Amino acid sequence: MKFFIKNVLLEEEKSDCIVIGVFEFCEFKYSNNYLNKSICSYINNFIKKGDMQGKVGETLLLYDVPNVVSKRILLVGCGKKNRLNRYYLDKIINKSMKILNKFSIKNIIFSLTEINIENYDIYWSIRTIVNSINKYLYKNFKINAFLKKEVYLNSISFHIIEKKDFHIANNSLKHALAINSGITAAKNLADLPPNICNPLYLSLQAQKLSEKYKDKIHVTSIDIKEMNNLGMNAYVAVGKGSKNKPYMSVIKYSGINNTEQEKIIVLIGKGLTFDSGGISIKPSNNMNEMKYDMCGAAAVYGTLIAAAKLNLPLTIIGILAGCENMPGGNAFRPGDIITTMSGKTVEILNTDAEGRLVLCDVLTYVQRFSPNIVIDIATLTGACVVALGNHFSGLFSNDDQLAYALEKSSRQTNDKIWRLPLSLEYEKELHSNFADLSNVGRGKAGAITASCFLAQFSKKYTWAHLDIAGTAWKSGKNHGATGRPVELLSQFLLNESNFLKF
């Protein structure tokens, strides 16, 4: 798929279809730089007759419009003026793409970038539209590949009216395509079946990044032998029941113009390629979805791809913490006491609370990099899904400034997060009579007590935890990975690197 920015007279541009937005209860008006008066009058006739009312997602396909070189114009309803937001825009793009695909259209021009989207300028309009298009294309290409159907669409252009906006629009498109490459990579990795995507496979995918981006990315793979030597006993314990041994990939991205004084940002992704629950085995219902317990690692993988394509002037260390939690003769048990890499001891009360055991050793391991910021991303708790549902990821942090920066990135991208508390009252729930900590709380607020557990191992640096258990994938009709929070993390890195949109 090719994308372009164009500053041309729409009626003179050749394409299979021009997509134009129409507001509800509004006369269609375009300046001479868009379409001339006779074309606007022609379109207004359909609006006056009631063929197009402008309701969100409503469409009307026009053929052979007088004085227009393109073969078709697709009118798409944008709802009430000044109320068009990202949610509605997503619906509009989805409906438009369905119509375009139905008629085997190969190249299109989107003129929606001139429509006023709530709180968005031209930069964010294009970012948002590209993101919506890629969401549709990802799903559609997968279905067509399965059904062995041809995909026709191969070129999308964005029309802008002001030449002064061309550089901004071009930058936006570059950013959008880089970030969406990361989102797609994360989805592709997460959607793989667990008999293919095991910890070794995850490690090999990381190695391929060093081959593809050899001037920017260096990868080190740490196997179970080295983990044992490092004292990562909690991490190793989780993988003991499986024949697929754990692998941890350390991916170092060194961006352009980075110096010794640059911030070092560490991203840690929980990579449980399958989580049966271990001895504390999960119910069989929906256990197939536990292949998605590595979506944190997939998100880190995708974010590093985006960073490499954006050439961000940062030093980023990504950790893919690959492991598989299975029952077996060597599996760890409820009642076990494990000495973590930090020296703290943990009493195991539930082997299905395994992600925090993997992460606690990784959080200790990354101290060697003297990081300025550490963010871990994990499908950590079902309790977070109960608290926030499937729309918001949970945010926990020991630093208000970092939490604010992540919340800002969330607002910019609409990749929603909600901050939850960390406090001593909740830490008391992790009390053990036999060890420093137990691996689960004894009361309620499971997402918070899990984060309090992680906080015990992240006191030496600025840290945040994203619980993506409710947002990493969708069930039901649209079953599949979402690629979240790659866009949020990529925007956070853009903001940290002061990569201005202009």
Swiss-Prot record:
Reaction catalysed by this enzyme: Release of an N-terminal amino acid, Xaa-|-Yaa-, in which Xaa is preferably Leu, but may be other amino acids including Pro although not Arg or Lys, and Yaa may be Pro. Amino acid amides and methyl esters are also readily hydrolyzed, but rates on arylamides are exceedingly low; Release of an N-terminal amino acid, preferentially leucine, but not glutamic or aspartic acids
Cysteine pairings via disulfide bonds: none
SUPFAM superfamilies in the record: Macro domain-like (SSF52949), Zn-dependent exopeptidases (SSF53187)
The record's free-text note on cofactor binding: Binds 2 manganese ions per subunit.
Keyword terms, alphabetized: Aminopeptidase, Cytoplasm, Hydrolase, Manganese, Metal-binding, Protease
Active site (UniProt): 282, 356
Enzyme's top EC category: hydrolase
Requisite cofactors: Mn(2+)
Intracellular or extracellular location(s): Cytoplasm
Database matches in Pfam families: Peptidase_M17 (PF00883), Peptidase_M17_N (PF02789)
CDD domains xrefs: Peptidase_M17
Binding residues for Mn(2+) 2: 270, 275, 293, 354
GO MF annotations in UniProt: manganese ion binding; metalloaminopeptidase activity
Enzyme Commission identifier(s): 3.4.11.1, 3.4.11.10
Gene Ontology process terms (BP): proteolysis
Residues that, per the record, bind Mn(2+) 1: 275, 352, 354
NCBIfam families registered for this protein in UniProt: PRK00913.1-4
HAMAP family, alphabetized: Cytosol_peptidase_M17
Name used for this protein in its record: Probable cytosol aminopeptidase
Species: Buchnera aphidicola subsp. Schizaphis graminum (strain Sg)
Lineage of the species this protein comes from: Bacteria, Pseudomonadati, Pseudomonadota, Gammaproteobacteria, Enterobacterales
Gene name of the record: pepA
